[in-house]
Amino acid sequence: QAGKDIRVLADSFVASNAYASGNAGAIRIASHNLTVDGTGGQQLTQISSQAFYVSQGNAGSIDVNTSGALNLINGGKIVTDTNNIGHAGDIHVTAGSLLLDSRNHVGLTGIYSSNDFDSTGNGGAINIQVAGDAQILQSAQVSSATWGKGHAGDVVFRANNLEVNGRGLGVAAGISSEVAETSGGQGGSITVNVPGHLKIFDLGLISAAT
């Protein structure tokens, strides 16, 4: 918990992982502004909880509460996933404003929960509550996906105003729930509540796909 700002910068991370029979612990972050920025990094820049292949436990939940801005940019991510029989953790975000912007980064930027190819556990739910404006730009995503035998988690997204704009990299930006061809699981539902303006441009999308 910080009274002002928290910044997670290039090649830095906050992580709680499961490697054995126990569960990973929860991550709880409270600050005025939170920025996860992969600019200049060569590796992962993220807040994550993962249940790895050799483990039997569950990944932990991630709770982020910012009274000001939450910015995930240029490869910055919030991630939960599972590679085993355990489940991925849920992600809860409460923010004054939200910016997900991959800029020129070709890798993942955004908020993700998934189960991977060899897993039988379920992906976690994603719940995002933004008091003001939210932007999902270039190839950034809010994504719930299943690649294994488990189910993808549900996605709930609320913001006063939302812009989804895939301009720039030729890759879609948006909010999605995906079931891969290799998966035996079911996709999660998507609920989007925007009482103000909802703008979707270029390769922007809100999609539930199998």
Model-derived regions: residue spans:
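Extracellular and secretory-pathway beta-repeat/beta-biased strand scaffolds
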Residues: 1-210
